[in-house]
Regions:
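Transcription initiation cofactors for RNA polymerase, centered on bacterial
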Residues: 2-44, 51, 56-59, 67
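Histidine- and acidic-residue-rich, metal-dependent catalytic cores
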Residues: 35-311
Length: 311
């Protein structure tokens, strides 16, 4: 299984046997993307100056095609992720989120591809940052953080020599850490001074980073990451883009175990598209600990809310 790139398995029990853990793209496409990004970044770390743009182009086109054909894209990115492979998995996830959001914004297929390529390569500059800083489990010093902040410009400068990478993809690499209030880097741009592609990538980058395990902290639940994005709209993130983004997110991914305001324990069975906080649940235990096996659609029971995510 490991040789096939399968590092994690989902275990089914009597409560989850018929629950589908949906992904926005095929597992095979995700594994291919991760493998290509890994090989690409490792070559740069080892001093090679060429980039295998053909493989990158093929996988970004595949991701774009799959997302364009998927009528009801719900982003369920909080599947099992590896801390050691964070940079590579994060690159694929950011590409997926960028393309999905770009689709909601009505971008052409060509624009989606360029945005997706930018998302795939947004952290390429980190290959030129010392790994002891990138993977430091403790808080970075001010000096170390200044070094980290060089990665957008390092990545942009590296890609400037590769003509097959679109200028629009490069601008994602250069500007994905800019923030609408001017507090970002490397140039401190504000609002519409930041290209819309980069404003899209900023949301994708932060959302996936928050919902991933890191060497210095555990992942956040999806709903908490979504709340962070909402709470920092117009300060860090573009309000209009956030409005398009949040309905695409599975706040409580399929298979999540939750506690309800009624005291019941439940498992998320499926999603109500467009209503990320109101999934369909399977009740498994009442407030007195008695076992249940009953469906509850939160969209039809607005007086009940999810109060806690167990797993």
């Amino acid at each position: 299984m490991l040789e096939l790139g399968v590092k994690h398995l989902y275990i089914e029990d009597r409560y989850s046997y018929d629950i589908e853990i949906n992904d926005a793209i095929k597992d095979s496409t995700r594994r291919t993307g991760k493998k290509i990004v890994t090989n690409t970044f490792d070559r740069i770390k080892n001093g090679f100056i060429d980039l295998n743009t053909k493989d990158l182009k093929n996988v970004v086109e595949d991701i774009t095609d799959e997302l364009v054909l998927n009528e009801d894209v719900l982003l369920n990115l909080v599947s099992l992720k590896s801390t050691s492979d964070y940079t590579y998995e994060h690159s694929v996830n950011v590409s997926v989120v960028c393309i999905a959001l770009g689709k909601m914004l009505g971008y052409s297929k060509s624009e989606l591809y360029k945005l997706g390529m930018g998302g795939m390569l947004h952290d390429i500059g980190k290959t030129l940052i010392p790994e002891e800083i990138l993977n430091k489990p403790a808080k970075l010093t001010d000096h170390e953080f200044e070094i980290i902040k060089n990665h957008p410009e390092l990545g942009f400068n590296y890609l400037q020599q590769i003509e097959s990478i679109s200028p629009l993809s490069r601008i994602v690499v250069y500007s994905h850490h800019e923030r609408v209030d001017g507090s970002g880097y490397p140039r401190g741009l504000k609002g519409d001074e930041i290209h819309e592609f980069a404003r899209v990538a900023a949301i994708a980058d932060v959302f996936d980073a928050l919902t991933s395990d890191r060497v210095y902290r555990d992942r956040w639940p999806t709903y908490k990451a979504a709340e962070y994005i909402m709470n920092h709209t117009e300060q860090l993130f573009d309000y209009q883009l956030v409005k398009k983004f949040l309905p695409q997110v599975s706040f409580y991914p399929n298979g999540s175990e939750v506690i309800l305001s009624s005291g019941h324990r439940a498992v998320v069975r499926t999603q109500n598209v467009g209503f990320p906080t109101r999934p369909v649940l399977r009740l498994i235990e009442d407030d007195e600990g008695n076992e249940l096996d009953k469906e509850l659609d939160l969209l039809k029971h607005m007086n009940i809310v999810i109060t806690k995510v167990i797993v």
